[in-house]
Amino acid sequence: MTPSKLKWAFFSYGHNLGDFTRALETAKGMKESGMDAKFFNHGGIHNHMIAEAGIDELNLYPELTWEQHQIIMDINRYKVKVGTPLPVSTKQWIEMAEADLEALAGYKPDGVYAGLNLSCMISVPYAKLPMVTQVPTVNCPAFIHKEMYNMPNTMEKNFFMQKVLPGFVKRKIMKKVLLGDSAKASLVTFNEARKHFGLPPIYNITDLVKGDLTILPDLPMLSGLKAEDLTEGYLYSAPIFSKMDLPIPSEVTNVFNRPGLNIFCSLGSSGYPETLKLIIKTLKAIPHFNIVCSTTSILDPKELGENTDRFYACKFLPAHLVNEMADIAILHGGQGTVQTTAWAGTPVIGIGFQAEQQANIDGLVRLGMAIRIPIYAVSPPRILKAIKNISKPSFVKNAVAVKTKIRATDGVKKSVELMNNFVLNNRN
């Protein structure tokens, strides 16, 4: 089907690098296909990239602040008590949804890409517009029903949970929790705002991030979930990750041109600062390790010490290019981060801070190109042991094989096709 020129409104969670870059890459692909695309975000530290990509934008108020984002991250990582409320008042939710509705009324889109901008889960159903979300495969109900969802290591607070309770039991627990009313306590103000607009409440995460069409920027070989087993309304595209249009700093080239093992480290925008500091301190202690680190937004690079001839840290780097230069990568397991490394064919040591990140790393473990260290087990000896093992030729060989398969896909092109066809098919 050849679409007429469609207008798409793009929303994303502008503080979350993974969600934001997936939205941005998809919007760029939408424009390249001849469609119209415009961004509407409630603030976010990454929003400057929208104009740099040549896409129209309108910032909406009230904004979701950085301080609110930090609390949301702690909720997602189980760093705070389960049931901790989202740090957004009923009034703010209503005002954010009203701002969405005003923007949508002015733009008159044919469809809305909602990302993880949660006010869209109020405004878009109220406006009765077609809504597309793009989420990790762990948020597909089938993934949970098939008991593939492992307990987050951050919930395993003691020896019994970590070492004694069998994995299959923990997966059954997570199934019951996630498909029940697990988010009810966290979503009180959100549901009060939905009630204000005449919408029913949402009590779990899978329903919270579900669109009329939900795209999984993933592949069965990575997630472990067959395409034919997906819940109705969920479809795979293929990996989507940022290829930042940034130059490689000369410092990176200088560090990686030294003799020794080249290591790239990044814990994305959701890793713990203290964990990143421990990793870098451990790596610096080994003279033949050459280390490049992208800190993103979790800390100031200066907190890791001065740059030297074998260590360089900065906030952002073109990760797809730096990964290609590295012998191994130490990562947090965010979907885009993992997929970038798979595209580059670089063996991975992964440390997941959320269940989704654990699942992403485990996908590469199954393919023989990664080792995962549970967050509770991160220590200098464990890190060094993993580096020794991941440097074996079998991991390199497997990583190259995965690279070939990933590069044969085009997740952006497929997502754009799915989105446009969804809107056109629902017009008929």
Predicted segments with their positions:
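Solvent-exposed alpha-helices and their adjacent loops that cap or buttress functional pockets
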Residues: A105, T206-L208, F256, V322-N323
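Short boundary motifs at domain starts and secondary-structure transition points
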Residues: M1-T2, Y203-D207, T253-F256
